[in-house]
Protein backbone atom coordinates (compact mmCIF):
# COMPACT_ATOMS: atom_id res chain seq x y z
CA UNK A 1 0.00 0.00 0.00
CA UNK A 2 1.45 3.35 -1.04
CA UNK A 3 1.63 5.98 1.70
CA UNK A 4 1.01 9.48 0.38
CA UNK A 5 1.30 11.50 3.59
CA UNK A 6 4.71 12.03 5.15
CA UNK A 7 5.03 10.39 8.58
CA UNK A 8 5.95 12.36 11.68
CA UNK A 9 9.65 11.47 11.46
CA UNK A 10 9.86 13.33 8.13
CA UNK A 11 8.84 16.82 9.19
CA UNK A 12 12.22 18.56 9.26
CA UNK A 13 11.94 22.33 8.86
CA UNK A 14 14.25 24.39 6.66
CA UNK A 15 15.32 27.71 8.18
CA UNK A 16 16.66 30.09 5.48
CA UNK A 17 17.98 32.54 8.08
CA UNK A 18 20.22 29.82 9.51
CA UNK A 19 22.27 29.60 6.32
CA UNK A 20 22.06 33.13 4.87
CA UNK A 21 25.77 33.82 5.51
CA UNK A 22 26.81 30.63 3.75
CA UNK A 23 24.63 31.45 0.75
CA UNK A 24 26.18 34.94 0.55
CA UNK A 25 29.67 33.44 0.42
CA UNK A 26 28.67 30.97 -2.27
CA UNK A 27 26.99 33.75 -4.24
CA UNK A 28 30.07 35.98 -3.99
CA UNK A 29 32.21 33.19 -5.43
CA UNK A 30 29.58 32.28 -8.07
CA UNK A 31 29.44 28.69 -6.87
CA UNK A 32 26.62 26.16 -6.89
CA UNK A 33 25.93 23.49 -4.30
CA UNK A 34 23.89 20.34 -4.74
CA UNK A 35 22.31 21.30 -1.41
CA UNK A 36 20.59 24.24 -3.11
CA UNK A 37 19.95 22.72 -6.52
CA UNK A 38 18.40 19.51 -5.15
CA UNK A 39 16.46 21.31 -2.38
CA UNK A 40 18.08 19.04 0.19
CA UNK A 41 16.14 18.85 3.48
CA UNK A 42 19.44 19.00 5.42
CA UNK A 43 20.51 22.34 3.97
CA UNK A 44 19.93 24.39 7.14
CA UNK A 45 21.77 21.89 9.33
CA UNK A 46 24.73 21.55 6.97
CA UNK A 47 25.09 25.22 6.04
CA UNK A 48 24.88 26.21 9.71
CA UNK A 49 27.79 23.82 10.33
CA UNK A 50 29.73 25.24 7.36
CA UNK A 51 29.36 22.04 5.35
CA UNK A 52 28.44 21.95 1.69
CA UNK A 53 28.67 19.75 -1.37
CA UNK A 54 30.01 21.85 -4.22
CA UNK A 55 28.46 21.36 -7.65
CA UNK A 56 30.99 21.86 -10.43
CA UNK A 57 30.48 21.84 -14.21
CA UNK A 58 27.45 24.10 -13.91
CA UNK A 59 24.02 23.29 -12.56
CA UNK A 60 22.34 21.78 -15.63
CA UNK A 61 22.18 18.02 -16.25
CA UNK A 62 22.04 16.23 -19.61
CA UNK A 63 19.95 13.34 -18.28
CA UNK A 64 16.29 13.13 -17.29
CA UNK A 65 16.15 11.08 -14.09
CA UNK A 66 12.58 11.28 -12.84
CA UNK A 67 13.54 11.55 -9.15
CA UNK A 68 16.04 14.42 -9.36
CA UNK A 69 15.48 18.16 -8.94
CA UNK A 70 18.61 19.37 -10.77
CA UNK A 71 17.70 21.37 -13.90
CA UNK A 72 17.58 19.36 -17.13
CA UNK A 73 18.21 21.10 -20.47
CA UNK A 74 21.06 21.79 -22.87
CA UNK A 75 23.96 22.78 -20.59
CA UNK A 76 26.23 25.78 -20.97
CA UNK A 77 29.98 25.54 -21.42
CA UNK A 78 31.64 25.06 -18.05
CA UNK A 79 33.78 27.74 -16.40
CA UNK A 80 37.50 26.80 -16.41
CA UNK A 81 38.06 29.07 -13.39
CA UNK A 82 35.63 27.06 -11.26
CA UNK A 83 38.31 24.88 -9.59
CA UNK A 84 40.09 27.97 -8.24
CA UNK A 85 36.85 29.39 -6.84
CA UNK A 86 35.94 26.10 -5.16
CA UNK A 87 39.42 25.94 -3.63
CA UNK A 88 39.04 29.52 -2.37
CA UNK A 89 35.73 28.63 -0.71
CA UNK A 90 37.21 25.52 0.92
CA UNK A 91 40.09 27.59 2.27
CA UNK A 92 37.86 30.43 3.50
CA UNK A 93 35.47 28.03 5.23
CA UNK A 94 38.39 26.08 6.71
CA UNK A 95 36.72 22.81 5.80
CA UNK A 96 38.25 19.61 7.13
CA UNK A 97 36.28 17.54 4.59
CA UNK A 98 34.82 18.68 1.28
CA UNK A 99 32.54 16.89 -1.18
CA UNK A 100 32.63 17.73 -4.89
CA UNK A 101 29.97 16.53 -7.31
CA UNK A 102 28.43 17.57 -10.63
CA UNK A 103 25.49 17.06 -12.92
CA UNK A 104 26.03 14.46 -15.62
CA UNK A 105 27.68 16.11 -18.63
CA UNK A 106 27.32 13.66 -21.50
CA UNK A 107 27.92 16.61 -23.85
CA UNK A 108 31.61 16.83 -22.87
CA UNK A 109 34.19 14.48 -24.42
CA UNK A 110 35.54 13.43 -21.01
CA UNK A 111 32.26 13.90 -19.14
CA UNK A 112 33.95 16.61 -17.09
CA UNK A 113 36.60 14.33 -15.58
CA UNK A 114 39.35 16.83 -16.32
CA UNK A 115 37.64 19.55 -14.30
CA UNK A 116 37.22 17.14 -11.39
CA UNK A 117 40.97 16.48 -11.48
CA UNK A 118 41.76 20.20 -11.68
CA UNK A 119 39.47 20.88 -8.72
CA UNK A 120 41.24 18.27 -6.59
CA UNK A 121 44.62 19.78 -7.51
CA UNK A 122 43.44 23.31 -6.69
CA UNK A 123 42.07 22.27 -3.29
CA UNK A 124 45.25 20.36 -2.44
CA UNK A 125 47.24 23.54 -3.11
CA UNK A 126 44.93 25.92 -1.22
CA UNK A 127 43.93 23.65 1.67
CA UNK A 128 46.32 20.68 1.91
CA UNK A 129 44.81 19.42 5.17
CA UNK A 130 41.30 19.10 3.73
CA UNK A 131 40.04 15.60 2.93
CA UNK A 132 38.55 15.52 -0.57
CA UNK A 133 35.58 13.35 -1.50
CA UNK A 134 34.27 13.13 -5.06
CA UNK A 135 30.80 11.99 -6.06
CA UNK A 136 31.14 11.38 -9.78
CA UNK A 137 28.73 10.57 -12.62
CA UNK A 138 29.24 7.38 -14.63
CA UNK A 139 31.20 9.11 -17.45
CA UNK A 140 29.37 6.65 -19.74
CA UNK A 141 31.75 4.03 -18.37
CA UNK A 142 34.76 5.59 -20.11
CA UNK A 143 37.91 4.10 -18.57
CA UNK A 144 40.08 7.10 -19.44
CA UNK A 145 37.76 9.56 -17.72
CA UNK A 146 37.56 7.43 -14.59
CA UNK A 147 41.35 6.99 -14.62
CA UNK A 148 41.83 10.78 -14.80
CA UNK A 149 39.77 11.20 -11.63
CA UNK A 150 41.64 8.43 -9.81
CA UNK A 151 45.01 9.90 -10.86
CA UNK A 152 44.10 13.16 -9.10
CA UNK A 153 44.21 11.21 -5.80
CA UNK A 154 41.04 12.21 -3.94
CA UNK A 155 40.60 10.61 -0.53
CA UNK A 156 37.20 9.09 -1.33
CA UNK A 157 35.59 8.55 -4.71
CA UNK A 158 31.88 7.82 -4.81
CA UNK A 159 29.33 6.92 -7.43
CA UNK A 160 25.72 6.32 -6.45
CA UNK A 161 23.76 3.32 -7.69
CA UNK A 162 20.65 5.17 -6.42
CA UNK A 163 18.25 2.20 -6.68
CA UNK A 164 17.90 -1.50 -7.46
CA UNK A 165 18.28 -2.88 -11.02
CA UNK A 166 14.54 -3.46 -11.51
CA UNK A 167 13.83 0.25 -11.04
CA UNK A 168 16.56 1.62 -13.30
CA UNK A 169 13.96 2.89 -15.75
CA UNK A 170 13.73 5.98 -13.52
CA UNK A 171 17.44 6.69 -14.18
CA UNK A 172 17.32 7.91 -17.76
CA UNK A 173 20.55 7.09 -19.60
CA UNK A 174 21.99 5.08 -16.70
CA UNK A 175 22.80 1.38 -16.53
CA UNK A 176 23.13 -0.64 -13.33
CA UNK A 177 26.03 -2.78 -14.52
CA UNK A 178 27.86 0.25 -15.89
CA UNK A 179 27.53 2.03 -12.55
CA UNK A 180 28.90 -1.01 -10.73
CA UNK A 181 31.77 -1.10 -13.22
CA UNK A 182 32.63 2.53 -12.41
CA UNK A 183 33.23 1.54 -8.80
CA UNK A 184 35.14 -1.58 -9.86
CA UNK A 185 37.42 0.38 -12.19
CA UNK A 186 38.20 2.87 -9.41
CA UNK A 187 39.05 0.05 -7.01
CA UNK A 188 41.12 -1.82 -9.60
CA UNK A 189 43.10 1.31 -10.52
CA UNK A 190 43.88 2.15 -6.89
CA UNK A 191 42.76 -0.29 -4.19
CA UNK A 192 43.83 2.25 -1.54
CA UNK A 193 41.25 4.76 -2.76
CA UNK A 194 38.12 4.32 -0.68
CA UNK A 195 34.92 4.01 -2.68
CA UNK A 196 31.40 4.92 -1.67
CA UNK A 197 27.88 4.49 -3.01
CA UNK A 198 24.33 5.30 -1.98
CA UNK A 199 20.77 4.14 -2.38
CA UNK A 200 17.45 5.94 -2.05
CA UNK A 201 14.75 3.82 -0.45
CA UNK A 202 11.01 4.18 -0.92
CA UNK A 203 11.03 3.86 -4.70
CA UNK A 204 9.34 0.46 -4.69
CA UNK A 205 12.33 -1.78 -4.00
CA UNK A 206 12.14 -4.90 -1.83
CA UNK A 207 14.42 -5.79 1.07
CA UNK A 208 15.79 -8.75 -0.88
CA UNK A 209 16.68 -6.42 -3.76
CA UNK A 210 18.38 -3.95 -1.40
CA UNK A 211 20.69 -6.57 0.04
CA UNK A 212 21.48 -8.01 -3.37
CA UNK A 213 22.72 -4.54 -4.33
CA UNK A 214 24.82 -4.41 -1.16
CA UNK A 215 26.36 -7.77 -2.10
CA UNK A 216 27.12 -6.38 -5.55
CA UNK A 217 28.78 -3.30 -4.03
CA UNK A 218 31.01 -5.34 -1.75
CA UNK A 219 31.99 -7.53 -4.70
CA UNK A 220 33.45 -4.49 -6.52
CA UNK A 221 35.36 -3.26 -3.46
CA UNK A 222 32.97 -0.57 -2.22
CA UNK A 223 33.80 0.45 1.37
CA UNK A 224 31.25 3.10 2.33
CA UNK A 225 27.47 3.21 2.03
CA UNK A 226 24.63 5.69 2.49
CA UNK A 227 20.95 4.73 2.70
CA UNK A 228 18.26 7.40 2.79
CA UNK A 229 14.56 7.98 2.19
CA UNK A 230 13.53 9.17 -1.26
CA UNK A 231 11.44 12.35 -1.10
CA UNK A 232 9.86 13.51 -4.34
CA UNK A 233 10.89 17.13 -5.06
CA UNK A 234 7.47 17.89 -6.58
CA UNK A 235 4.28 16.22 -7.80
CA UNK A 236 5.76 16.02 -11.29
CA UNK A 237 8.61 13.81 -10.10
CA UNK A 238 8.53 10.05 -9.53
CA UNK A 239 6.13 9.44 -6.63
CA UNK A 240 7.23 8.02 -3.30
CA UNK A 241 6.14 4.39 -3.09
CA UNK A 242 6.59 4.02 0.66
CA UNK A 243 8.27 5.44 3.76
CA UNK A 244 10.91 3.42 5.62
CA UNK A 245 10.72 3.78 9.44
CA UNK A 246 13.87 4.90 11.31
CA UNK A 247 14.17 1.56 13.09
CA UNK A 248 14.36 -0.24 9.74
CA UNK A 249 17.12 2.10 8.61
CA UNK A 250 18.95 1.28 11.87
CA UNK A 251 18.53 -2.42 11.16
CA UNK A 252 19.88 -2.02 7.64
CA UNK A 253 22.91 -0.16 8.99
CA UNK A 254 23.80 -2.94 11.40
CA UNK A 255 23.31 -5.61 8.78
CA UNK A 256 25.40 -3.72 6.21
CA UNK A 257 28.23 -3.30 8.71
CA UNK A 258 28.06 -7.01 9.50
CA UNK A 259 28.35 -7.74 5.77
CA UNK A 260 31.66 -5.87 5.61
CA UNK A 261 31.08 -2.18 4.87
CA UNK A 262 33.53 0.04 6.77
CA UNK A 263 31.04 2.81 7.51
CA UNK A 264 27.31 3.17 6.88
CA UNK A 265 25.05 6.21 7.24
CA UNK A 266 21.44 5.03 7.22
CA UNK A 267 18.36 7.07 8.10
CA UNK A 268 15.37 8.89 6.64
CA UNK A 269 17.28 12.13 6.06
CA UNK A 270 20.60 10.61 5.02
CA UNK A 271 21.93 11.83 1.67
CA UNK A 272 25.20 10.98 -0.11
CA UNK A 273 27.20 13.71 1.57
CA UNK A 274 25.33 13.84 4.90
CA UNK A 275 27.87 13.54 7.74
CA UNK A 276 30.47 13.01 5.02
CA UNK A 277 33.31 13.80 7.39
CA UNK A 278 32.40 10.70 9.41
CA UNK A 279 33.38 8.49 6.49
CA UNK A 280 36.83 10.08 6.38
CA UNK A 281 37.37 9.34 10.05
CA UNK A 282 36.82 5.64 9.33
CA UNK A 283 39.36 5.48 6.52
Swiss-Prot record:
Metabolic or biological pathway: Protein modification; protein lipoylation via endogenous pathway; protein N(6)-(lipoyl)lysine from octanoyl-[acyl-carrier-protein]: step 2/2
Which SMART domains does this UniProt record tie to the protein? Elp3
Cofactor(s) the record lists: [4Fe-4S] cluster
Report residues binding [4Fe-4S] cluster 2: 61, 65, 68
Q: Does the keyword 4Fe-4S apply?
A: yes
List the catalysed reactions. Answer: [[Fe-S] cluster scaffold protein carrying a second [4Fe-4S](2+) cluster] + N(6)-octanoyl-L-lysyl-[protein] + 2 oxidized [2Fe-2S]-[ferredoxin] + 2 S-adenosyl-L-methionine + 4 H(+) = [[Fe-S] cluster scaffold protein] + N(6)-[(R)-dihydrolipoyl]-L-lysyl-[protein] + 4 Fe(3+) + 2 hydrogen sulfide + 2 5'-deoxyadenosine + 2 L-methionine + 2 reduced [2Fe-2S]-[ferredoxin]
What enzyme class is recorded for this protein?
transferase
Q: Which PANTHER family match?
A: LIPOYL SYNTHASE, LIPOYL SYNTHASE, MITOCHONDRIAL
Q: Which HAMAP family match?
A: Lipoyl_synth
UniProt lists the family membership as follows: Belongs to the radical SAM superfamily. Lipoyl synthase family.
- Protein name, UniProt field: Lipoyl synthase
Which organism is this protein's natural source? Answer: Geotalea uraniireducens (strain Rf4) (Geobacter uraniireducens)
From the broadest rank down, the organism's phylogenetic lineage runs: Bacteria, Pseudomonadati, Thermodesulfobacteriota, Desulfuromonadia, Geobacterales
